[in-house]
Every structure is written in structure tokens, then in C-alpha cells.
Amino acid sequence: VDEEQGVKPLEVVAAVIRDAQGRVLVAQRPIDKHQGGKWEFPGGKVEQGESRRSALGRELNEELGIEISSSKRLISIYHEYEDKSIYLDVYEVNHWGGEPSGCEGQPVKWVEVDELKTLDFPDANAPIIDAVCLPKLLKYLKPVATDGAFREQVNQSLEDGHKLLFHNYEEQPISHEQLNWLLDTAAEKKAEVVFQSPPPLVRNDYGIHLNHEALVKAHEKPAAQRVSASCYNPGELFKAQRLGVDFIILEPVLMNLFSTGHEALGWPMFQSLAARVNIPVYASGGVSEKDLELAREYGAQGIASTSLS
């Protein structure tokens, strides 16, 4: 197949390699290559007859001189440039042998996760950076009866290490004082809060979640620190992608939602739907923390649930 004519997308694999400090390894593309001079996540083309994980191991050995011992799926992306289209399969690598270096003369460096958004990457890498920055677990805050129980739940969630909390304001309205306390307390732990149907706020350090009705009505991405959306079908997934949301919650995966009439998707259908968009997708509906590794193999960013320790 003539890749230059765009007959078939170029299959590419890439690795998000993290060290013990949580830093990520990036490499600079040669000036004479496509998107030359920009930073990238190490990887390369999948050869004919080669599995993607085999290609990943080969490329990292050739480029960096390391032998990877394990990898986990992070995100898959389809992107069209003016001169070619690519299908990019991205894996997280946390365990390897050897010391990474630029074996082909390319500059490489370790960067903090927060620094990734300041570097010049090819356009196709934007969803990868989003996926790297997002946690694997999204914690739904449960409706509770008292202010004390509300604060206890928030404090416990943050103490457990959760970095992304979800509060449904429609389901449990809270006072402005509680709302500001929630955001301040989360910020102290470097965590984010996403609200569904929040009241008008004078601050901007929070996220907005679009439920089904809000997604259908939306004509542009709301102004917020982060925007997410709930989706049940391909049409809603594509609408969320057109709006440019930062992540999607796709449901229900393992349980029927009788209140909305939606039947459980199951993991194969979840994988098929999630693969249609270039956005991190969380699995929700009947799933818990024990399903995390399975969810990731099926293409999920992670799990969204109340059932998280």
C-alpha cells in the first residue's frame, strides 16, 4: 500500500515511559523528518506482519537501547495530517531494562507531567498528553445527608489519593460555602473537581460535566478548567468530540440503566465505541476498581465509580 497517497493509515506505536519519580521521557524528531524538530513520545512504524506490542519493543530498543518488560494500553488515536493519516496506538511503560539514551542521535529528556503541555508536539499527540495528565480513577461523590458527612467523604477521598472528583449538583445541591471549601480542599491536594449542573461561580478552577441533555443542547465547549461529557451511543461520542471535551464517561458498561432505558454495553462494545474518538474515555456503570486493568485493555482511560477505595 502506498502510504504517501493516503490509501491506508500509517500504523504507529508510541510509548509513555515513566521513571520512578513520575517523569516522562520525550524525544525530539529529526529536522528532516515529518513534523521535524517537534517533541514526541518514542516509538515508530509497525512493520508488516508485526504485532503492535512487538513493534513497540523493537522501536524502543532501536531508539533508546532499552528492553521493556511490560506495557499497558493508554489510548488509540486516528489523525489526519495534510500529507498523511496515522493510526497511533499508545502504551504506558513503567518497567524496562537499560538506561534510555538517544541511540539514533536524537535529543531525549525527562520532563515533569505538567511540563508536557508547554512543549511543541505534533497535533496528533494532544490526546496523549490529556491521557497522561488524567488519573486512572474518577471518584463519584455520593449524596449524603449532612454537611459533616459531605466533608468526611471529600476528605477521605482525597486522603485515599483520588485526584479527580465528580459532584452532581442536581443530585445534591450544596451551599456556596461548601462548594468553595470543596474546591479549596481539593486544590490543597492537587486534585480537580468536576461538577454536573453547578451554579454560577466567580472562580474558574473547576470542571463542568455535560450530562445527556446538556450535551445535546451544547453548541460550544463551556468555559471551564476541564469539560467532560456522558455518552451512551456513537452520535453522542462524536458530538462530544466536536465540542472538544477533555474526557468522556461512556456508560453503562456492566449494568442496565433502567432509569434511562440503556442496556449494558459489555466490554467488546465499549471498546468498539471508545475507539471511535480521539479522547480519553472512562468506563462507568456497574464497574469498580477491580475492573481497572480489564477496562484499560479494552481501551479505557480508567474507571468512573462510587466504588473506589
Identify the function of each model-found stretch.
Residues 193-208, 232-244, 276-283, 287-306:
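Catalytic cores of alpha/beta
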Residues 212-220, 247-261, 287-309:
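Glycine-rich phosphate-binding active-site loops on the catalytic face of alpha/beta enzymes
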Residues 77-99, 109:
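Active-site-adjacent beta-strand/loop module that shapes the phosphate/pyrophosphate-binding cleft
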Residues 204-214, 226-275:
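Glycine/Thr-rich beta-alpha phosphate-binding loop at enzyme active sites
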Residues 2-24, 76:
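Conserved N-terminal beta-strand and adjoining loop/helix that marks the start
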